[in-house]
């Protein structure tokens, strides 16, 4: 997917507006993050709603659960995974709550057959933002803004920093919380696990390795150019 710096900045600024608006909706609605069981049920509901618009997102036989290795995964950098032997979507429910809705829809995308990480990110986004759940909207837009902002930084650090400054204060607080969480769970093993996983992705037709996740940015640019919305 081809895009230039102006496309990246355009996408970043749209996501900036989306994540700020979603956070305001969460605050004004006094939304409270649900229990794990309710979270997974609501993730399934998000696919049910998205299916009305995108029939290919039909999600049958829900099977999502908390990862038994959540605490261990914190130190290895895992937020969730798809178990190909059981067909279950596993969500690390020890990570910050605001990440978990999008993690759930991402892992459920793998269950639908979207094996590549950029595809699972995009399908998870479609499910999350087409739901009527502001917690899912915020979770997806938060993660996607971070992806886009990081990409912009490589080409225009001034534009990247300017966007960060324009975030809602509560969104900034969540970024601080996420950074602190990552700092608290640094380990000697994480760089090695990241390297191994990156090579695993390359062996499975994802040549960008660990950076495959970021390729959702190009898909979002293409989607916006075709449909005029994110």
Give the label of every model feature segment:
Residues 93-101, 113-117, 134-138, 189:
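Solvent-exposed, acidic/flexible segments
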Residues 13, 17:
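Cysteine-nucleophile amide-bond enzymes
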Residues 102-121, 125-126:
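Active-site recognition of the HExxH zinc-binding catalytic motif
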Residues 21-93, 97:
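Auxiliary, metal-adjacent structural segments of Zn-dependent hydrolase domains
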Residues 1-8:
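Alpha-helical transmembrane signal-anchor/signal-peptide segments
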Residues 19, 23-26, 47-54, 93, ...:
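Sec/Tat-exported extracytoplasmic proteins
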């Amino acid at each position: 997917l081809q895009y230039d710096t102006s496309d990246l900045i355009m996408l970043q600024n749209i996501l900036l507006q989306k994540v700020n608006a979603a956070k305001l909706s969460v605050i004004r609605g006094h939304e409270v993050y649900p229990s794990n069981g309710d979270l997974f049920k609501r993730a399934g509901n998000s696919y049910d709603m998205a299916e009305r618009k995108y029939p290919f997102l039909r999600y049958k036989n829900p099977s999502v659960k908390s990862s038994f290795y959540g605490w261990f995964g914190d130190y290895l950098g895992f937020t969730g995974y798809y178990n190909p032997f059981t067909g279950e979507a596993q969500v690390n429910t020890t990570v910050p709550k605001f990440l978990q809705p999008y993690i759930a829809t991402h892992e459920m995308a793998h269950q639908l057959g979207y094996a590549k990480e950029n595809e699972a990110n995009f399908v998870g986004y479609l499910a999350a933002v087409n739901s009527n759940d502001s917690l899912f909207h915020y979770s997806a837009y938060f993660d996607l803004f971070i992806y886009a902002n990081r990409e912009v930084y490589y080409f225009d650090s001034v534009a990247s920093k300017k966007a960060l400054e324009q975030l809602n204060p509560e969104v900034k607080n969540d970024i601080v919380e996420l950074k602190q969480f990552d700092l608290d769970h640094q380990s000697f093993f994480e760089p090695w696990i990241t390297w191994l996983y990156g090579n695993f992705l390359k062996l499975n037709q994802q040549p960008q390795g660990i950076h495959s996740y970021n390729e959702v940015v190009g898909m979002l640019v293409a989607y916006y150019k075709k449909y005029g919305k994110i």
